[in-house]
Structure formats: structure tokens, C-alpha cells
A protein has these predicted regions:
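Conserved phosphotransfer microenvironments
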Residues: 71-89
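Two-component/phosphorelay signaling modules centered on CheY-like receiver
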Residues: 30-49
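Conserved acidic carboxylate
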Residues: 27
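Conserved phosphotransfer cores of two-component systems
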Residues: 62-64, 87-93, 104
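A Lys-centered signature of the CheY-like receiver
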Residues: 117
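Non-catalytic signal-transmission and effector/linker regions of two-component phosphorelay proteins
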Residues: 1-22, 55, 120-138
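Acidic, metal-coordinating helix/loop segments flanking the phosphotransfer/catalytic sites
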Residues: 50-68
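Hydrophobic/aromatic residues positioned on beta-strands within the core alpha/beta folds
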Residues: 98-99
Length: 138
């Protein structure tokens, strides 16, 4: 995540904007995963992960079905997240893809959004907020 100079930066603590949202985070970069997880927790989300592999992500999904998934499409050792996208789509879990690549080809309807790294906090939240807002019990 990159910070911007916008006056609309998120609060640093105590926010409940995403309270109760169960979010699966799949990211093989420790630094990126930690930054995203910290932001989501500050905003009140319950975050599983970051999972660095598809196998880890599948275990987290089985342990606790997420409301939303945030996934880096290319993981360690060239592992592609497409099989994970299929599983999440079968369970009607909205997916946000984050990637360092300028071009990503995914079948239509698999993801809510594709964000290119580095992603600003504002860009990230502009996509995530409406997804969380339409979850049941919101």
C-alpha cells in the first residue's frame, strides 16, 4: 500500500467502518500483506491471513468462510491463484485482485476489481467499502 497526501486518509485507530467483515488476505509478500492486514484491522475487519500459498488460503477458507477475499494473483514459485478464484466464485465470495503486473487476464465475472500495485489507501477503500456495505447484516 502506498500512502498519498489526500486529506481523506483512514483513521489510525478505533474505526468500525469494516467491523464484522471477515476478510481473507492472500499475498506472498510479507511487507504488502502486513500493511494491508494492519489497515483492515484498524478499520475493524476480522482478517484471515495473509496466506502466501493456495494451500494456505484453502485451509483458511475451510476454517472460516470469508465475506470478501483480497488476492494477489501471482504467488510464490509462480503459483497462480486461478484455482482459488474458482473456489471463491462457487461460494459467492467477492474477490478483489491486487497485482504488480500491468496486464492481467481473468475470465469475466470472477472478480469485483483488479488493482495494480502500488495501491493507494484511497483506491483500495473505494473498492472495498461498497463490497462490505452490501454484505448481509450491513
Amino acid at each position: 500500500m502506498k500512502a498519498t497526501s489526500s486529506p481523506h486518509t483512514p483513521p489510525t485507530s478505533g474505526s468500525s467502518e469494516l467491523k464484522g467483515a471477515r476478510i481473507l488476505l492472500v499475498e506472498d509478500s510479507w511487507h504488502v500483506g502486513t500493511a494491508i492486514k494492519r489497515l483492515l484491522r484498524i478499520l475493524g475487519a476480522d482478517v484471515s491471513g495473509p496466506a502466501a500459498t493456495i494451500a494456505d488460503a484453502k485451509r483458511l477458507i475451510a476454517d472460516r468462510k470469508p465475506d470478501v477475499a483480497i488476492i494477489d494473483i501471482n504467488l510464490r514459485d509462480g503459483e497462480q491463484a486461478n484455482p482459488l478464484l474458482d473456489r471463491l466464485q462457487e461460494q459467492d465470495i467477492p474477490v478483489i485482485v491486487i497485482t504488480g503486473y500491468t496486464s492481467v487476464s481473468l475470465p469475466p465475472g470472477k472478480v469485483e476489481a483488479i488493482l495494480q500495485k502500488p495501491v493507494s489507501v484511497e483506491q483500495f477503500l473505494a473498492i472495498l467499502r461498497p463490497i462490505v456495505a452490501r454484505l448481509p447484516d450491513r
